[in-house]
């Protein structure tokens, strides 16, 4: 769930991130698209952990992608095992406090500003204990945390220990993600642009084609924000993009 959901509109978010000439992403470095020739495309699918609509269809996709799993939800264990059985990469979709959303939307085990540093670190470590094979993390909601250097530093300290990257969903224009990640030595991938969509498969397909024009991390969802529609669009457009010379990779491959 994102914080800026417009009523009746589903979103496909695209993150600008180009892997240039085999150069690795250094800790704290954010590489943006500069009109380079398309090379690799990573798809990150949010909101696993709810047994949401489209989960089966998404996991049946033949291309590699990264599944962002809610760590403390009713269907976390079941969805995570299904992701593993499908051979897909797991990220932790970490629930974090929002500036505008209700606390209960985040859940009891989210990261909140009224927690001290030790409690935040323990909460993030608990998420990794639930999903020990997670190759990285991105924020679920989280505008309040992404603007709070102290809270965010505690999160990044655990990611540094684990040696995994963080994807900043940019739920706030005032995000301190890049600065704090650089300070803590954590590789950061930063959202570049949001694109909205309707329930039309064709519209989502056009968004994916747009992603193929520049190398991006494309973010979609299982559940009501995407689900079967997004899965169908990816299935139909992926061969077209591959014929155009684009290679699908996981998110962690872009951060190596």
Predicted regions and their residues:
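C-terminal domain-boundary segment and adjacent tail
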Residues: 159-171, 225-256
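Active-site beta->alpha N-cap acidic-glycine motif
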Residues: 34-104
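Hydrophobic, well-structured mid-protein blocks that either form specific transmembrane helices
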Residues: 117-166
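Catalytic beta/alpha-barrel core
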Residues: 48, 66-72, 138-148, 163-174, ...
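N-terminal pre-catalytic segment of deacetylase/amide-hydrolase enzymes
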Residues: 5, 10-43, 48-57, 249
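Hydrophobic faces of well-ordered beta-strands that scaffold small-molecule active sites
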Residues: 41-45, 65-67, 90-94, 137-139, ...
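Alpha-helical scaffold elements lining the catalytic groove of polysaccharide deacetylases
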Residues: 105-106, 110-129, 146-150, 179-212
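His/Asp/Glu-enriched short active-site or ligand-binding loop at hydrolase and phosphoryl-transfer sites
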Residues: 158-202, 249-252
């Amino acid at each position: 769930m994102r914080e800026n959901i417009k009523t009746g509109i589903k979103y496909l978010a695209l993150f600008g991130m180009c892997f240039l000439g085999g150069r690795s992403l250094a800790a704290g470095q954010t590489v943006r698209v500069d009109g380079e020739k398309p090379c690799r495309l990573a798809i990150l699918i949010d909101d696993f952990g709810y047994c949401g609509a489209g989960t089966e269809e998404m996991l049946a996709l033949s291309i590699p992608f990264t599944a962002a799993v809610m760590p403390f939800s009713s269907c976390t264990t079941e969805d995570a095992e299904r992701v593993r059985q499908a051979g897909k990469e797991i990220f932790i979709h970490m629930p974090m406090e929002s500036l505008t959303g209700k606390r209960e939307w985040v859940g009891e085990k989210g990261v909140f500003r009224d927690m001290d540093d030790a409690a935040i670190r323990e909460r993030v470590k608990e998420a990794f204990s639930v999903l020990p094979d997670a190759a990285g993390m991105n924020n679920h909601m989280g505008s309040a945390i992404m603007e709070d250097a102290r809270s965010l530093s505690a999160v990044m300290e655990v990611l540094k220990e684990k040696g995994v990257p963080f994807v900043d969903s940019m739920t706030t224009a005032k995000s301190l993600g890049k600065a704090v990640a650089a300070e803590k030595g954590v590789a950061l991938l930063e959202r570049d642009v949001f694109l909205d969509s309707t329930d039309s498969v064709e519209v989502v397909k056009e968004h994916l084609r747009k992603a193929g024009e520049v190398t991006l991390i494309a973010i979609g969802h299982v559940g009501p924000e995407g689900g079967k529609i997004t899965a169908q669009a990816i299935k139909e457009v992926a061969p077209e993009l591959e014929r155009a010379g684009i290679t699908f990779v996981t998110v962690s491959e872009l951060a190596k």
